[in-house]
Design a protein with these regions (language model features):
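Signal peptide-directed extracytoplasmic domains
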Residues: 61-227
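N-terminal targeting leaders characterized by basic, low-complexity, disordered sequences
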Residues: 1-22
């Protein structure tokens, strides 16, 4: 008889686990040396293709970016001040569409060693020049002259855009337009009035490093010289007109018609209306007012410039004008017309005058079939 006590939890003894078979390295699939070389070669080849493509794309972009922006031959004035950096010069050139890329300009000047050789001065450049040509010009330091044309019939806002296109900065334009000028031409101008109408249209030759303020002073000189030499001042005074009043009326004549003969007859109409105490009734005045106000151009517009509603002359000129408009106010045509209308359609470019309102309405019906309806 077995008197040994039974083994406790014998039923719960763990069943021994099978031994773990080690995985031998030699049992794993191994690439052959030739296959490994082939994979590495393909990887390197792919990387080379990517790098070559990127390099080619960069080279193509750079070649394009340092090229001429366009075929335009317009002249643009650029002034480089002492102390200006290549980065700042690139900003100015790009602002005036003279280079395609500021980055490419900076890279070019770095690669060519010209970055610190750009000279201060006034330059006349064109959009049809490439970066190489521009940089060579600026390294030479030769100051240019520019023929700058101020067109007639432009408002001050339009002249601002024209001067910017010529290469003057916004800051320089603001300074020139807001400066105080001591000139006899401006003596009768009301206090606080701007330069609307007083920038004389002409072509001026100037050094590219001259300021816009200096150019405006030359335009005032030219304007006043014309008034004196042509005896316009004397005629204005005979009619009881100050320079400011005469220039204001001439600007309206300029915007109404451009034909010198018609300008003289239009001036006769306006002068007679003023003498008779009638409103000028000029559409171009309320159109100007609407543009300044950002409003719809209607005859009922509430503005001191609207001569459809306000008697007498508006507060000031509405544009600059040709010498022919100044002459028209000084020496108007004879006659006693009170009305005129510009023709359209087959009568485009012609102006029709009338003494009575009935005649005027008949002219409108016969000659202004589209614009007047």
């Amino acid at each position: 008889m077995d008197i040994r006590p039974p083994r406790p939890n014998a039923a719960r003894e763990k069943t021994p686990e099978p031994p773990i078979k080690p995985v031998l390295l030699e049992n794993m699939p191994v690439l052959s040396t030739s296959k490994r070389r082939k994979t590495l070669t393909l990887t390197l080849a792919g990387l080379a293709v990517v790098l070559l493509g990127a390099t080619t794309s960069t080279a193509l972009w750079y070649s394009w970016a340092i090229g001429a922006p366009s075929d335009e031959e317009r002249q643009v004035r650029v002034v480089v001040e002492p102390g200006d950096t290549a980065t700042g010069i690139a900003e100015t050139l790009h602002e005036h569409d003279l280079i395609r890329s500021k980055l490419a300009f900076n890279v070019y000047t770095q690669l060519t060693g010209t970055r610190s050789k750009l000279q201060a001065g006034g330059y006349v450049l064109s959009p049809n020049q490439d970066v190489s040509s521009i940089v060579d010009h600026m390294v030479s330091g030769e100051t240019d002259e520019i023929d700058l044309t101020i067109p007639p019939g432009l408002t001050l806002d339009e002249l601002r855009k024209s001067f910017f296109a010529d290469g003057f900065s916004e800051a320089e334009i603001d300074q020139a337009f807001s400066a105080s000028y001591d000139h006899p031409l401006l003596a009768s101008r009301p206090a606080g009035a701007d330069l609307e109408g007083y920038i004389y249209p002409e072509t001026y030759r100037m050094n590219a490093n001259q300021t816009l303020g200096e150019l405006l002073e030359r335009s005032f000189d030219e304007f006043y010289r014309v008034l004196e030499e042509k005896k316009y001042l004397e005629e204005y005074q005979k009619r009881g007109l100050s320079i400011h009043q005469a220039v204001t009326l001439a600007s309206i004549v300029q915007k109404e018609v451009t034909n010198p003969t018609d300008q003289k007859q239009v001036a006769q109409v306006f002068l007679k209306r003023l003498n008779d105490g009638m409103m000028l009734g000029s559409d171009v005045t309320f159109i100007y007012a609407a543009e300044q106000m950002g409003a719809e151009a209607t005859p009922g517009l509430d503005s001191p410039y609207n001569t459809r509603k306000v008697s007498g002359l508006p507060p000031g000129p509405i544009a600059n004008m040709n010498p022919s408009a100044l002459e028209a106010v000084a020496f108007p045509a004879g006659g006693d017309y009170l009305y005129f209308v510009a023709g359209d359609g087959p009568d485009a470019g012609k102006t029709f005058f009338a003494r009575t309102e009935a005649e005027h309405e008949a002219n409108i019906t016969a000659h202004c079939r589209t614009l007047c309806n």
